[in-house]
């Protein structure tokens, strides 16, 4: 229901109330001159009553809108981590080729562009630091134990000799892209994994594996590796927002991380043996596709300033617009509002923290145009009429129309500023 329909319904409700009032008043005061129904009233009086009903509906609509706006702005400033939209997330897998001879380190927050077949571009950021190693899973063997349990031999190969061990090694547990089966396998690793050992070299004869020079490894860590998020890692998400991302796409918890020792000479491959105390889960088949190296979780976010606004006292509410309208960006989370003055960029305080002039409030996702939501910046600056100020909004943006234009496969490339 749009605003016009809401206003018209409120007007009909007011006219119904006026009609009931006129009927009750006519019953109590029969000689007042008012008719028992509005349709029988004098045209001038009828128009006056309709005007009263219309303006009453407008006042009621404006008051309701202002109360809702004030309540939402208050919640937005106190609990922004609960009201911010959840961006799209995903996992990109690096496919190694003969051209990759050395590991490639990708920092956390590295920007990528995903271009679909219809030439739409979407901006993504990596969620954690990762390293692409020139390796791939050649084979996986499931070997039953002597009495109980079993062993899983994962044979890694590379197209060129490795001068250094692929440390740290992050592996994604992905069972035919099924979340439930993948988490079932992750639970099996966490509950039944007893030990992990490493053999540096190509696995030729598995039957002779007991004679190999094995190196014992620490048990793997899972998920985000237990590393706390710090400000210098360019992280702007609240811990609750991170938990909301998990419930939207829990695959980031399907990673296991291994610490490998240094190698003394070049190697052409290596084998990792996982020893379990329980048999392999029923209904799951061990194949080389269940453990995937070189995977990076990423998120559809981009940090950039909004269009600058000029607070000159004529208006107090300004739309927060992206500098790239054609890209379909919507405001995900404001990071700060700054005023340009002689000292440079001065941050403004939020209205819920301080009423010191100037301060600001954010009205998020209140205007919808052509299927997109826009937010407003409200400035409390009484001196702006005599002393105009130029303001900038630093924010995180996302592209919610990604799901409408997602076509697989797509081209992914690093974004060069």
Predicted segments with their positions:
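C-terminal accessory/interaction regions of large nucleic acid-associated machines
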Residues: 2-17, 336-417
């Amino acid at each position: 229901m749009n605003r016009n329909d809401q206003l018209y319904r409120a007007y009909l409700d007011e006219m119904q109330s006026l009609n009931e009032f006129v009927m009750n008043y006519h019953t109590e005061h029969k000689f007042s001159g008012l008719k028992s129904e509005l349709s029988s009233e004098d045209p001038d009086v009828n128009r006056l009553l309709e005007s009263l009903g219309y303006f009453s509906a407008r006042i009621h609509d404006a008051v309701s809108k202002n109360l809702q706006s004030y309540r939402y702005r208050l919640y937005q400033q106190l609990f922004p981590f609960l009201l911010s939209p959840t961006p799209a997330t995903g996992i990109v897998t690096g496919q190694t080729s003969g051209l990759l001879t050395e590991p490639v380190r990708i920092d956390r927050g590295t920007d990528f562009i995903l271009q679909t077949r219809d030439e739409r571009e979407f901006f993504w950021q990596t969620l954690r630091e990762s390293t692409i190693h020139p390796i791939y899973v050649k084979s996986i063997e499931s070997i039953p134990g002597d009495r109980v349990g079993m062993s899983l031999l994962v044979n890694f190969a590379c197209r060129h000799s490795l001068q250094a061990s692929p440390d740290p090694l992050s592996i994604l547990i992905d069972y035919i892209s099924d979340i439930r089966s993948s988490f079932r396998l992750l639970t099996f690793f966490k509950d039944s994994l007893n030990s992990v050992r490493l053999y540096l070299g190509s696995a030729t004869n598995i039957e002779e594996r007991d004679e190999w020079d094995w190196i014992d490894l620490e048990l793997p860590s899972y998920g985000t590796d237990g590393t706390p998020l710090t400000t210098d890692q360019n992280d702007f998400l609240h811990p609750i927002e991170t938990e909301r991302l998990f419930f939207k796409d829990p695959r980031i918890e399907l990673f296991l991380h291994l610490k490998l020792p240094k190698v003394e000479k070049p190697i052409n491959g290596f084998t990792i043996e996982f020893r379990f105390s329980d048999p392999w889960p029923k209904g799951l088949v061990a194949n080389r596709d269940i453990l995937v190296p070189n995977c990076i979780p990423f998120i559809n976010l981009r940090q950039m300033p909004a269009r600058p606004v000029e607070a000159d006292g004529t208006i107090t509410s300004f739309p927060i617009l992206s500098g790239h309208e054609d890209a379909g960006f919507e405001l995900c989370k404001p990071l700060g509002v700054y005023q340009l003055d002689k000292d440079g960029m001065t941050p403004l305080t939020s209205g819920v923290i301080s009423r010191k002039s100037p301060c600001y409030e954010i009205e998020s996702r209140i205007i919808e145009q052509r299927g997109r939501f826009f937010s407003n910046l409200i400035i409390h600056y009484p001196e702006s009429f005599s002393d105009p100020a130029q303001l900038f909004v630093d924010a995180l943006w996302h592209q919610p129309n990604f799901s409408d234009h997602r076509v697989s496969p797509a081209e992914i490339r690093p974004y060069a500023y």
